[in-house]
Design a protein with these regions (language model features):
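Multi-bladed beta-propeller domains
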Residues: 1-9, 35-57, 88-121, 141-173, ...
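Short, low-complexity Ser/Thr-rich regulatory SLiMs
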Residues: 63, 90, 281-285
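Short glycine/serine/proline-enriched coil/turn segments at secondary-structure junctions
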Residues: 29, 76-79, 94, 258-259, ...
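A flexible loop/linker signature enriched in serine peptidases of the S9 family
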Residues: 4-9, 25-34, 50-55, 71-86, ...
């Protein structure tokens, strides 16, 4: 065990093989911190790299250039409303030398801005989802060796979809870098699709049968994710991004006849304050029951989303 038993929680870590250390998030009675542990020792006290007055999440390490990125927000804000992207330069021991903060003031915006899922490319560019356009789209940030931003490409891929999830838990990922390109999942009208976002600004939709994605990670030209469809239960999805061949391993087998599974029909209706609300209607479909029951599910929270993947609990 790397750490001594104590009154704190560790999560969201990354491994720096160059320095042979684990860098991760720690929560204790004083707040949130970024800490490190040597991979060559056991039962250590944490090495404190950074301490926050607020909350931390989504570490992204570029060990080749000694750079670390993360998301930070105050305790009075929800992370999907307002947060900051922090970019730090590390020394040879893994301690922070300097940081740069990206927020609505940096981008000269009066509106609140939210960042999600910072990811480093092989070339050392930082990609992050942010909603300055009103949609969570991907922004590219190029920095110099001192960690100073030199080029920020906002709205490189202009598309009115959400390429992010509300930050309720650690470990979520909606896109990943593949060479000069980005592969990611995006939501439109409650349906998730998979696409390649090419460096030249074009977007290529990947043809496949799934409409729910989460936990996207890539290695070279292969992508893995958790996916499901309206008739296929949730499982591990793997795709070769060169020839687009894919495999799906369900977590459990579906014992229902596909003819007995109702397919959701997307529709919009007018809710309170004349706001438009999206929903899914599942028409009754069951040959064994003459009068199928009516089930209505709703969520009044700020980030609830009606999904169309197969859910056998419903």
């Amino acid at each position: 065990c790397l750490s001594k038993k104590n009154n704190y929680f560790l999560a969201g870590g990354v491994i720096d093989l160059e320095k042979n250390i684990w860098i991760g998030l720690m929560e204790d009675y004083d707040g949130d911190h970024i800490v490190s542990y040597s991979l060559e020792k056991t039962y250590q006290q944490p090495n404190f790299i950074y301490s926050s007055q607020g909350l931390l999440g989504y570490l992204a390490l570029n060990s080749n250039d000694n750079k670390l990125a993360w998301i930070e927000w105050t305790k009075t804000s929800m992370p999907w409303d307002l947060n900051e992207l922090k970019l730090a330069k590390l020394n040879e021991k893994g301690n922070i030398i300097r940081t740069v903060s990206f927020n609505n003031e940096y981008f000269k915006l009066k509106e609140k801005i939210s960042f999600f899922n910072p990811v480093w490319s092989e070339k050392g560019d930082l990609y992050v989802a942010e909603d300055s356009s009103g949609w969570w789209n991907i922004t590219q940030i190029k920095t110099d060796t001192d960690n100073k931003p030199i080029v920020i490409s906002q709205n490189k891929w202009t598309i009115q979809v959400e390429i992010a999830f509300p930050q309720w838990v650690l470990g979520m990922s909606s896109f990943s870098c593949v060479g000069d390109d980005v592969v990611g999942a995006f939501a439109k009208d409650g349906v998730w699709s998979l696409a390649l976002f090419h460096n030249n600004g074009s977007i290529q939709i990947i043809d496949q049968p799934f409409n729910e994605f989460s936990g996207l990670y890539s290695n070279q030209n292969r992508l893995v994710a958790i996916s499901s469809s309206s008739v296929i239960s949730e499982g591990i999805f793997e795709i070769d991004l060169l020839d687009k061949s894919w495999e799906h391993t369900p977590a459990s087998s579906v014992i229902l006849d596909p003819k007995e599974i109702s397919i959701g029909e997307s529709f919009w209706f007018t809710g309170s304050n004349e706001d438009k609300v999206h929903a899914w209607y599942y028409p009754p479909l069951n040959s064994q029951i003459s009068l199928p029951p009516l089930l209505v599910k709703s969520h009044s929270g700020p980030t609830g989303m009606a999904r169309c993947g197969l859910d056998l609990e419903v």
